Amino acid sequence: MGSTRRRSVSLYHASGCHLCESARRVLASVQRETPFDLREIDIGGDRELEARYREWLPVVEIDGERAFVYYVDPDAFRRKAQSQSSA
């Protein structure tokens, strides 16, 4: 039986993005009850990241896989964050 590890969550955002602020609040709320590692990446000023993510913000990736764009549903995110991966 394998051990479990915490999910790694990345939030790609930009300054002044109201949807990004909403996503940040959802992640913070779920993180209080379900621990996961959160990395916030501001795409501003990085041409490669802007080209890749600008049209989709906010973008949430879980363990390197795109899970949400535009809107983060709290219940759906909670389910994904709670389903542990085998290490």
What is the predicted function of each stretch?
Residues 31-35:
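Short helix-capping segments at alpha-helix termini
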Residues 36-47:
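Thiol-based oxidoreductase modules, predominantly thioredoxin-like and allied folds used
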Residues 21-25, 51-55, 72:
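Generic recognition of short, well-ordered alpha-helical segments
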Residues 58-66:
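A short, hydrophobic beta-strand/beta-hairpin element that forms part of a small beta-sheet core
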Residues 65-87:
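Non-catalytic, surface beta->alpha helical segment in thiol-disulfide oxidoreductase systems
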Residues 45-59:
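Short Fe-S-cluster ligation motifs
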Residues 2-29:
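Local sequence-structure signature of Cys/Sec-based thiol-disulfide redox active-site neighborhoods
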